[in-house]
Structure formats: C-alpha cells, structure tokens
Design a protein with these regions (language model features):
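Catalytic "initiation/cleavage/transfer" segments centered on a nucleophilic residue
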Residues: 1-7, 12, 21-34, 102-164
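Short, flexible coil/linker elements and helix-boundary hinge sites characteristic
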Residues: 48-49, 83, 123, 162
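Histidine-centered divalent-metal-coordination microenvironment in nucleic-acid enzymes
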Residues: 65-103
Length: 164
C-alpha cells in the first residue's frame, strides 16, 4: 500500500470511526465534511498570544490527531503497518495542546504508550506540549506549564516502569 496523504488518511479515518472527539463535544465527520466550506476554525496561539486560523490541511491534521487519541490498538497497528508515518509528523492539535514529532515507527510506538500513561495519570490540559526526542538520546521530554516553565526528561526505562 502506498503512503497516504492527509486527505486519504482523513477519508480512511471516516470509514473506521464516523465521529471524533474534542474536549467539549462529539462531531460527526461526514456532516462536518459536507459543510466544510462554511467552517472557520480559530484557536488561541499561546506562543504568539494571538488568535490563529487553521488552513484546510491543518484542519485535516487536527481531526486525524484527535482521532488517533481516541483510536484503538488495532487501528494504530494498521497505521504503522501501512507506513503512514509521514502523515503523522509534526501534527498540531489545539484541543489536545500537543505537538507531536514522530521520526519513525518506533518513536510512534512510544508516543502512543506515553499518551496512554499520561491519560491515566495526568489531565491533558496540564501538558501544553509533548515533544518526542530522537530514540538515540534515550529519553522523552514533556514540557509542562504551571507557575513556571518546567522541562522534565524521562528515559525509556522510566516509561517501562510506569514512572509516567
């Protein structure tokens, strides 16, 4: 199977899960697609302290990222098995407040593992940015914002032992 582009992946996503979740509501993707030209999606860009508009491709990415957050293991295995990794690089989802960098399939596995751990232990709103480092560095960095910026480093051993 050839690598999917953003739109192909979006269409595939509709076939396996007709809805996607954000923090507040469940949205029917087919209905969303029908009224697509009328949609304006703005979000508050914390980095630049201004409202920003998502272009069409970014909206696709947003939906995909949201879907991946809700999807099951079989679907994740499908994504990795069919080499759809390129599509998943540098996805930004304003509702989930995360930046995801996935250089390869192995890091992708760790990403899902981390998300599962974080979901069990931390509210997503507490993590504005998740950056997955190169595996050679043997660590995963989660940058959290509270009273002050905090950068916490975890090793793969930490993950396996359930530290996060």
């Amino acid at each position: 199977m050839n690598k999917m582009n953003i739109k192909d992946m979006f269409n595939w996503m509709i076939t396996i899960q007709p809805t996607y979740h954000n923090r507040h509501k469940k949205v029917n993707i087919n209905e969303l697609l029908k009224s697509y030209k009328h949609i304006t999606l703005d979000y508050y860009d914390k980095k630049y302290k201004r409202k920003a508009h998502l272009h069409k491709e970014e909206q696709y990415k947003q939906m995909i990222c949201s879907h991946l957050y809700e999807t099951n293991t079989a679907d994740r295995e499908y994504l990795i098995k069919n080499n759809i990794i390129d599509v998943l690089k540098e996805l930004y989802h304003p509702h989930l407040h995360c930046l995801i960098s996935c250089p390869n399939e192995e890091i992708m596995d760790y990403f899902f593992f981390i998300k599962k751990k974080m979901r069990m232990k931390y509210p997503l709103s507490s993590c504005d940015l998740i950056k997955i480092n190169q595996l050679e560095e043997d660590q995963i960095r989660a940058i959290q914002y509270g009273d002050k910026e905090q950068s916490i480093f975890y090793t793969k051993t930490d993950l396996i032992n359930g530290v996060i």
